[in-house]
Amino acid sequence: MDADEGQDMSQVSGKESPPVSDTPDEGDEPMPIPEDLSTTSGGQQSSKSDRVVASNVKVETQSDEENGRACEMNGEECAEDLRMLDASGEKMNGSHRDQGSSALSGVGGIRLPNGKLKCDICGIICIGPNVLMVHKRSHTGERPFQCNQCGASFTQKGNLLRHIKLHSGEKPFKCHLCNYACRRRDALTGHLRTHSVGKPHKCGYCGRSYKQRSSLEEHKERCHNYLESMGLPGTLYPVIKEETNHSEMAEDLCKIGSERSLVLDRLASNVAKRKSSMPQKFLGDKGLSDTPYDSSASYEKENEMMKSHVMDQAINNAINYLGAESLRPLVQTPPGGSEVVPVISPMYQLHKPLAEGTPRSNHSAQDSAVENLLLLSKAKLVPSEREASPSNSCQDSTDTESNNEEQRSGLIYLTNHIAPHARNGLSLKEEHRAYDLLRAASENSQDALRVVSTSGEQMKVYKCEHCRVLFLDHVMYTIHMGCHGFRDPFECNMCGYHSQDRYEFSSHITRGEHRFHMS
């Protein structure tokens, strides 16, 4: 017994450095505690017994840490590590636990009636002696585990092993779905969430979902503060529990009309895809000066504050602008009519002009194209639209028509004989606008507009004559046309802002500074 005590005392005094290797020494076992420490006489013998207790706890801690506790841990590493370290203390028999409680003076803890230990310095409650011992190192400054390469010291061996991987560059944790590798297990766990499909964490204020709870908590703080600054109620959406069955959600979605739900899904998905290039800032009556805005923040955080009813309004405007019939795929026109760009806009009640003596072409293909195409020309032309602007050179790059053609014609619309009830616009008499109905088929092939892909195939394009921008996707064109006002094409259909020309209108839509009057 004296030899064993001498060996333990030499280990406590620092003659033998703590092991830093990854292989645990399974042969080391905790030293037995003397049966009756209270009857020990003499200060020297009492000091020896205290050192034996401390050495015993330390050996148990080292063996526990070496048996797989050197895994990667982040912000929750201390709590998790301490709980696992205390598992060995729970395996002690009753007499051993009683003897350890009487010798807590070496650890510096106070045994509570519920069996837990209380730190005599700060009062924190620990679940076992191992946890208390690691906690006491934060007070004493003891760092027994030291790196032999740079000299950095740590309170736990798991932290040392993780630090050693910085020198070796080892990344043992690898993703089985991609080439991602990391040094920490928790980092791999967080990375695997990016491959998952579901987003179980949902905000009760705006309904946005997240994959991680931490992202939801950050969003809730921003979203709730924004709603309070706008004077809106604390909850715009009913709080949906995370354990909501997916089948119930699917049944609720089926209640929506098939055609409307399909359109909304298509439009919403396209809006989400282009959110990174079109930041939206929605402001209330307080104005720009009263609403703080961080220009360095990404759009992902800014767009989270956008309320869902605002997006629904924009989507509904696009549907009302083009009508349900126009959202269906267009009927392919004959080859003879492919010269004219098909552009949809049933905004006005159009009627086919019945002019007497109108010469007709001998080709039936051109006749069908003339019947389906009507040209609307504005009586008032804005000369400033032709002025070049350095900041809008990208829009001018899509202009392929001549100046004479622009002054001669304004907007080309493909009606496809849509019934008047399918359109949601206003008639010409109600608008009091002087539009002339002209022929759309141009006999000059130089006025034709064609877009050819890299493979040489002709692509179908949709052109907004208000902004003179081409779209290769019909849904994107539909969303864009929904931004134009019903009465004035340069009036924002979301907030009512009036622009002077297409440049100002495009800048307003791109910046997304929509001002809404909320009651």
UniProtKB/Swiss-Prot annotation:
The record marks 188 as: Required for both pericentromeric heterochromatin localization and DNA binding. Keywords: Activator, Cell cycle, Chromatin regulator, Chromosomal rearrangement, Cytoplasm, Developmental protein, Disease variant, DNA-binding, Isopeptide bond, Metal-binding, Nucleus, Phosphoprotein, Repeat, Repressor, Transcription, Transcription regulation, Ubl conjugation, Zinc, Zinc-finger. Changing residue 184 to Q: In CVID13; abolishes binding to DNA; has diffuse nuclear localization. Belongs to the Ikaros C2H2-type zinc-finger protein family. Residues 468-471 are annotated as: Required for binding PP1CC. Pfam families: zf-C2H2. One of its GO terms (molecular function) is DNA binding. It comes from the Eukaryota. The N-terminal zinc-fingers 2 and 3 are required for DNA binding as well as for targeting IKFZ1 to pericentromeric heterochromatin. The C-terminal zinc-finger domain is required for dimerization. InterPro entries: Ikaros_C2H2-ZF (IPR050589), Znf_C2H2_sf (IPR036236), Znf_C2H2_type (IPR013087). The modification Phosphoserine is found at residues 13, 63, 101, 168, 196, 258, 261, 289, 295, 298, 361, 364, 368, 389, 391, 393, 397, 402, 427, 445. There is a cross-link at residues 58, 241 (Glycyl lysine isopeptide (Lys-Gly) (interchain with G-Cter in SUMO)). This is DNA-binding protein Ikaros. Abundantly expressed in thymus, spleen and peripheral blood Leukocytes and lymph nodes. Lower expression in bone marrow and small intestine. Residues 38-47 have a biased composition (Low complexity). Transcription regulator of hematopoietic cell differentiation. Binds gamma-satellite DNA. Plays a role in the development of lymphocytes, B- and T-cells. Binds and activates the enhancer (delta-A element) of the CD3-delta gene. Repressor of the TDT (fikzfterminal deoxynucleotidyltransferase) gene during thymocyte differentiation. Regulates transcription through association with both HDAC-dependent and HDAC-independent complexes. Targets the 2 chromatin-remodeling complexes, NuRD and BAF (SWI/SNF), in a single complex (PYR complex), to the beta-globin locus in adult erythrocytes. Its main location: nucleus. Phosphorylation controls cell-cycle progression from late G(1) stage to S stage. Hyperphosphorylated during G2/M phase. Dephosphorylated state during late G(1) phase. Phosphorylation on Thr-140 is required for DNA and pericentromeric location during mitosis. CK2 is the main kinase, in vitro. GSK3 and CDK may also contribute to phosphorylation of the C-terminal serine and threonine residues. Phosphorylation on these C-terminal residues reduces the DNA-binding ability. Phosphorylation/dephosphorylation events on Ser-13 and Ser-295 regulate TDT expression during thymocyte differentiation. Sumoylated. Simultaneous sumoylation on the 2 sites results in a loss of both HDAC-dependent and HDAC-independent repression. Has no effect on pericentromeric heterochromatin location. Desumoylated by SENP1. GO terms for cellular component: cytosol; nucleoplasm; nucleus; pericentric heterochromatin; protein-containing complex. GO terms for biological process: chromatin organization; erythrocyte differentiation; lymphocyte differentiation; mesoderm development; negative regulation of DNA-templated transcription; regulation of transcription by RNA polymerase II. The record marks 159, 162 as: Required for both pericentromeric heterochromatin localization and complete DNA binding. Disulfide bonds: none annotated. Residues 154-163, 180-195 are annotated as: Required for both high-affinity DNA binding and pericentromeric heterochromatin localization. It is linked to Defects in IKZF1 are frequent occurrences (28.6%) in acute lymphoblasic leukemia (ALL). Such alterations or deletions lead to poor prognosis for ALL.
